[in-house]
Amino acid sequence: MLYPTEFDVIVVGGGHAGTEAALASARMGAKTLLLTHNIETLGQMSCNPSIGGIGKGHLVKEVDALGGAMAAATDEGGIQFRILNSSKGPAVRATRAQADRVLYKQAIRRRLENQPNLWLFQQAVDDLMVEGDRVVGAVTQVGVRFRARAVVLTAGTFLDGKIHVGLNHYTGGRAGDPAAVSLSSRLKELNLPQGRLKTGTPPRIDGRTIDFSKLDEQPGDLDPIPVFSFLGRAEQHPQQLPCWVTHTNERTHDIIRSGLDRSPMYTGVIEGVGPRYCPSIEDKIHRFASKDSHQIFLEPEGLTTNEFYPNGISTSLPFDVQLALVHSMRGLEQAHILRPGYAIEYDYFDPRALKSSLETKAIGGLFFAGQINGTTGYEEAAAQGLLAGINAGRYAQEKDAWCPRRDQAYLGVLVDDLVTRGVSEPYRMFTSRAEYRLSLREDNADMRLTEIGRELGVVDDVRWDAFNRKRDAVSRETERLRTTWVTPKTLPADEATALLGKPIDHEYSLAELLRRPGVSYDGVCGLRGGECGPSEPLAEDELLLAQIKEQIEIGIKYQGYIERQAGEIERNGANENTRLPDGIDYTEVRGLSFEVSQKLNQFRPETIGQASRISGMTPAAISLLMVHLKKRGLGRRKGADSVPGADVQADNTAAQQ
């Protein structure tokens, strides 16, 4: 039957990408339908019970700055919070949280059920409705046909998924869930370029059978307790729990080696490529043969379960080998396995067949997000889902897409890497992938993106008000520090020595004092009995006050580096964002080699910047392209139109601070 209501956007899949996509399009006012094979698994953490980490935490903060749900749900469900790289510079500091699976899933579902303009429907999707070169809806497994102007496909590992435990295998999207076989076949009929990838998960362990007295305890950060959302509070966190650390040993490695003849990875049964930065324990033993031990983190799955996730032993070895390798580790000698580990092999589609909006080039209105694009990780999926949801909503509203730049957000880096370079293995975000990471910090994600989110319609009044109070306070206080001066006469020598190590010998602004190593904002404001502090509190709320102080300190201490990077962004921006016409035939560009013109015609980059990052492109080829565009009066700056964010420049110094 044809469902009587037509929607603006249909989202297929209720994982981390799908939930963010549905919430984003609905926040924009688009009538949105979220189709899932099981409403009870909305927002489910299919693998590890954690959110964030290096690069990943940056994405979560950006999703939050744009009104997304992941950070807030983590604050409500997080049972341990830590700041990674806390002793290093602000560019690489990252938040990571262990999450209670049940509480996290409840927080996501609560937001979905209370979001205006969003409808839920439980049915697996078997087919897409395509008319000509555009998608017009989706068909469920019992034949219900839903029409929409745009469809976002977030199928995760479900497309023709195959689960492997040893040499045994069966179809499945994840343990306990069916694979999307019909939908996978339908997508192949559309001639979208696809391949196979694989990922894996470790066996789960009953905490009642772990000897914690033999393990090293790893508590979370307590002073202060981190929060993920810019609107979050530590008081939202439930009870906090420690993680525990054990190690593999030579006996463990011998057990693993003895089972490789029954490993689907090492017998050619699995053809898909696995994630380089989250390898199976089989891969670790093989690739790092000289190491006699690997660290294993035992992570609690929640407050109401005894289940532990042994992070570091993802495996598809036969169950008897899994049991033996677990029992070989300190503290796990009597451990009971609740669920066996497994590998899952699934279809993905070459992201080079996508526009930067995550819309497929071949089929108008069809957007892909998450693992279907060859990425790995909840955070990468959520970020893509948010962007796809925004652009699906804008497509339905007949507005131009928003495509964040590499200098604007890690989300821009992620998407640009995918659509220009493609993937040969599951893609994971790291800070090292960003050229401008000093400008793309966790702490300033809201300064970079919340104003854009407001223009896009995904930032509500509460977030907008908090952001403006923070931004205004940072601006006012930074200016006060730059224009307030102390001299040897007005600053007592003993106070200067206590703060700076010696008396001052000439006039300094408070900002110049703050720029010195080891000097804090509170230290400067405490000079002269507190007279150097602001006349009024910067904020009544303690969390907001801490965020304001952090922005002020980083902005002043790193001012020179930030301004230098802003200049680099401006210099590179002219060519980086120059658009390439949609219909250009690169064989007609004089001087281009056949190989280069063939690649350009195949991948159809949207900008000169994207073209420059295609494998095999040379500076000479880029110069020839620029000459071709100039001669024919083609090309314009990407973002030089009415797209939100075009006038919110990432090189604005205030936004970087």
Curated annotation (Swiss-Prot):
Subcellular location: Cytoplasm
GO biological processes: tRNA methylation; tRNA wobble uridine modification
Entry's Gene Ontology molecular function annotations: flavin adenine dinucleotide binding
Residues noted as binding FAD in the record, renumbered to the chain: 13-18
Co-factor requirement: FAD
First and last residue of the signal peptide: none
Annotated stretches, region: Disordered: 636-657
KW tRNA processing (keyword) present: yes
Domain of life: Bacteria
Keyword field contains NAD: yes
Alphabetic keyword roster: Cytoplasm, FAD, Flavoprotein, NAD, tRNA processing
List of residues binding NAD(+): 274-288
GO cellular component: cytosol
Family indicated by similarity: Belongs to the MnmG family.
Classification via PANTHER family: GLUCOSE INHIBITED DIVISION PROTEIN A, PROTEIN MTO1 HOMOLOG, MITOCHONDRIAL
Subunit structure comment from the entry: Homodimer. Heterotetramer of two MnmE and two MnmG subunits.
Protein's name in the database: tRNA uridine 5-carboxymethylaminomethyl modification enzyme MnmG
Organism field: Burkholderia mallei (strain ATCC 23344)
Upper classification of the organism: Bacteria, Pseudomonadati, Pseudomonadota, Betaproteobacteria, Burkholderiales
